[in-house]
Amino acid sequence: MFDVVISDIEAREILDSRGYPTLCVKVITNTGTFGEACVPSGASTGIKEALELRDKDPKRYQGKGVLQAISNVEKVLVPALQGFSVFDQITADAIMIDADGTPNKEKLGANAILGVSLALAKAAANTLQRPLYRYLGGSFSHVLPCPMMNLINGGMHATNGLQFQEFMIRPISAPSLKEAVRMGAEVFNALKKILQNRQLATGVGDEGGFAPNLASNAEALDLLLTAIETAGFTPREDISLALDCAASSFYNTQDKTYDGKSYADQVGILAELCEHYPIDSIEDGLAEEDFEGWKLLSETLGDRVQLVGDDLFVTNSALIAEGIAQGLANAVLIKPNQIGTLTETAEAIRLATIQGYATILSHRSGETEDTTIADLAVAFNTGQIKTGSLSRSERIAKYNRLMAIEEEMGPEALFQDSNPFSKA
C-alpha cells in the first residue's frame, strides 16, 4: 500500500447528552478514507485532569461553547499534521502535545487534541478495513469487559440528595457480554417497577440511572438488592454491587472532613457497607487530595475490595506511578479525555497492568453517540467497563457496540471480569 497520509482535519460543534457543546472531529486521508470521533465531557472532574477548553462567551451556551477548540484544530493541528502517516499514532500525538506545550493541554484544549487523536486511529482502522479494536489491539484482543451498570444516580449526576454518585451492579455470573447486558436490563426494569410501586420518582440522571429521593446511601443499596432478587438473580453469586462515592465532591479541603466526618470515619462507613452488602468495587472512596485517607482505605479494604482511583489518578501515568509507589488503591479508572491522547491513554493502561492494578475503561457523564470506548476496552483487554445504565441512547450505544464485537468475534470472544475480588 502506498503512503496513506493525513490530508485534512475537520471539526464541528455538536451537542452532548446534557445539551452542552462538544467537538466532533473528522480526520481525512489522501485516499478518501476517514475517521470521526466525538469528545465526551465530565461533571465530576479531577483537579489534575487535562483542560477541557471552553469559550467562556456568556452569549453562547452559557459560556460552554467550543469554537476556540475548533479553531485550534483548524489553525494549529491541521498544518502540524498534514502529510503525516495516518498509521503513526504515537508521532501524531507527540506532535499535538508539543504544539500545545503545556502540562495539562490548556493552550489548545484536551478536547481538541483528543478528538483528533481518536479520529486518527479510526481513520487508520478504516483505511485497513479493520474494526478499531482489532487495529489497536491486534489478534490478542479478545476479552469482552464486565460492565459496571449505574442503576441509581446521586451526587453531581442527579439532584436527589444522595451523597454517593453512582450505585452500580456487576453481572459477574454472566457467561457472555450479551447475557451480562440481559441481566442488567432485567434488573433495571425490575427496579423501575419497584420505584413505581413505592411512588418514588423514575426519572433518570445524567448516566441513565434512576434518581429517586432517598434518605441514605444504604437505602439505595437495599433497593438494588431487592431489584436483583425480583429479577430472579442472587446477590453476590450472580450480581455484585459497586459504588462510585466521588468523595471529592463532599470533601471540605479546609478542615479535611467529609460532611463533618474524618477520613477514618469515612473509611469506617465504607468498611461497614462492605460488611452488609455484596460490594466488590469502590471508586473514589476518598478525596483525590486525601492521601492519608487513601492509605488507610487501601490498608483496610485493599485485600478484599477493588479500590478504584479516578480523580486520584486522572488517567495520568505520573500520578498512577506515584499512587502505586505509595500503595494507594488497586485499580485505575481510564478516561481518555482526562489525559487527552490515545497514546497517553494506552500508556496509563500499560503501566497499571504491569503493576498488577486492574483497569476499567470509562465513559463520562456528558456523552455522545460515539462508541470508541467500547472498542478501546476490547483492544486493551481491560476486562471492565463503565458506560452507564440500561437507558439513554448514548449509553445503550456502547452496550450495543460491545454485543456487536462479541458476535463478530464468535467463539474467539472471551467474557472476563478483571476484578480479582469478584465473588463469582
Curated annotation (Swiss-Prot):
Cofactor requirements of the protein: Mg(2+)
Residues that bind Mg(2+): D244, E283, D310
Chain sites annotated for binding (2R)-2-phosphoglycerate: Q165, K335, R364, S365, K386
One example GO MF annotation: magnesium ion binding
Assigned keywords, A-Z: Cytoplasm, Glycolysis, Lyase, Magnesium, Metal-binding, Secreted
Catalysed reactions, semicolon-separated: (2R)-2-phosphoglycerate = phosphoenolpyruvate + H2O
E.C. no: 4.2.1.11
Disulfide-bond pairs as recorded: none
Name of one Pfam family that matches: Enolase_C
Protein's pathway: Carbohydrate degradation; glycolysis; pyruvate from D-glyceraldehyde 3-phosphate: step 4/5
Superkingdom classification of source: Bacteria
Main localization, broad class: cytoplasm
InterPro entries registered for this protein in UniProt: Enolase, Enolase-like_C_sf, Enolase-like_N, Enolase_C, Enolase_CS, Enolase_N
Annotated active site: E207, K335
GO cellular component, one term: extracellular region
Family per record: Belongs to the enolase family.
Known function: Catalyzes the reversible conversion of 2-phosphoglycerate (2-PG) into phosphoenolpyruvate (PEP). It is essential for the degradation of carbohydrates via glycolysis.
Protein name: Enolase
Lineage: Bacteria, Pseudomonadati, Chlamydiota, Chlamydiia, Chlamydiales
